Amino acid sequence: MPEFVSPFSGLAHERKLTPEELIRAIRFMIAAEYEAIQLYMQLADSTDNQLAIDVLKDIADEERVHAGEFLRLLRELDPEEETFYAEGAEEVEEEIKKSKKA
């Protein structure tokens, strides 16, 4: 689980990131975006104030865009990442086919 105390949690400050560290940091940022989406949507679901609901949902949508940007960057930095996503998608496709036959 990401630790949000510091944006550089676990990272060295006195040098540039290695490619592997950058990839890990991008994964951390993706997790942070998804956590932010969850928090904004929970708050929106917890109020009757329509203005707050609208603003929170809009911000959550912006976080989804950020997650997409980070995911695209991750795929560029680590092309092998896409093979894992494709494998996972194929596994779900197989389950979908099974459930439609049942």
Features from the language model and the residues they span:
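Iron-associated oxidoreductase/ferritin-like identity signal
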Residues: 1-102
